[in-house]
């Protein structure tokens, strides 16, 4: 019996211990569950924003049934900084936002006004018309209006005067003036210097003005021509002119070589004025975009001509989407006018496209919110912090990465006078030294002559100066006198 009682007591004790252990484990599991709920509580209580956007590469794209792109990364960074959750929806009508014929706003702006979305995170341009109905944050991207072209449709045609292209018109004008001035200085110095003739009253000087022009032209061709200078003053001018022509020809050959080697990279359409003047390409923009209304409201005559062209051919030249515009540029003779930053992306993705140099209408992409929304200022401060930390630059480089191998050659342009400023200055100094040397030579001769004829040096110098500057008249008078004597 004792053994039986001990056995029963052991069984009861074991059952009680197991029951307490099970109850304690259950208590611990309930506590853990309660703790997990507390951790999820703050996440579940985060404000949820409905975000409207538009599908445009590289801002928002659909890949593997998920959205990604520049704006999605930006939205994630803002949500992390401001502690909110979000739901992203693509705008129903596929438009950015403009006033329709019935006075209502379309696109993402319309969805915010109808309270279908809280904010719009997209390449949405900040304009005065949109600012009147919604609020914008600080721009997260800066852009402008540019011209997207196809390279092979814009190869520059050679003209008969293409050889003049290495220098600008101002440079050619300066060179012509320098040539005439140098030849005149040669002519003047040769007449003043006593070393260029023995008897100026009886002998004609070899450096006439026509001969001086011929001498200067021969130096331009790197050819030695007569007359040969004998005086130091004339040789100074001749030497400085030779150095000038050598440097000038080197600059011309280098720039002309760069012009020929650049080939099709030289765009005849550099500006919007060039676009209006040409007749080879059609041009247009996105229908209802801020770019279209920029030209409509502009007072610039060139911009008005662009608007009138697009408005008259609205059904033919205006496109519905950015992807359609890029494809049309690649497939036909069409130039697309739009956001320069988007055109840079197209040129990076498609190596046969290029953006014209001129960019007008500086503007920015901002996040749109409802007016008086408490999120406007918060988002603006967050965007500024992302810019200051370099995160916006990182996103820009990440999504605008190019697959093209661009040559590191700079775009060619005609040589301007400023580039040859030092060369012109050297020539001017040489001409001045030559004239001074000629005056010194004539002064020395006048001083020696004054000692023989018992006259002042100044009077002799003046007589010599007048005689040499009127030598042709004196020679003609002497010839007429000799002719009368023979008669």
From Swiss-Prot:
Glycosylation sites: 104
Sequence ranges on the Extracellular membrane side: 24-169, 257-419
Coarse class of the protein's main subcellular location: membrane
GO CC, alphabetical: postsynaptic membrane
Membrane topology value: Multi-pass membrane protein
Transport keyword on record: yes
Top-level taxon of the source organism: Eukaryota
Sorted UniProt keywords: Cell membrane, Glycoprotein, Ion channel, Ion transport, Ligand-gated ion channel, Membrane, Postsynaptic cell membrane, Receptor, Signal, Synapse, Transmembrane, Transmembrane helix, Transport
Cell location: Cell membrane; Postsynaptic cell membrane
InterPro entries given in the database record: Glu/Gly-bd, Iono_Glu_rcpt_met, Ionotropic_Glu_rcpt, Iontro_rcpt_C
Cytoplasmic side: 191-235, 441-487
Any Pfam family the entry gives: Lig_chan-Glu_bd
One GO MF term attached to the UniProt entry: ligand-gated monoatomic ion channel activity
Signal peptide bounds: 1-23
Residues spanning the membrane: 170-190, 236-256, 420-440
UniProt family annotation: Belongs to the glutamate-gated ion channel (TC 1.A.10.1) family.
Role this protein plays: Receptor for glutamate. L-glutamate acts as an excitatory neurotransmitter at many synapses in the central nervous system. The postsynaptic actions of Glu are mediated by a variety of receptors that are named according to their selective agonists.
The protein's name: Probable glutamate receptor
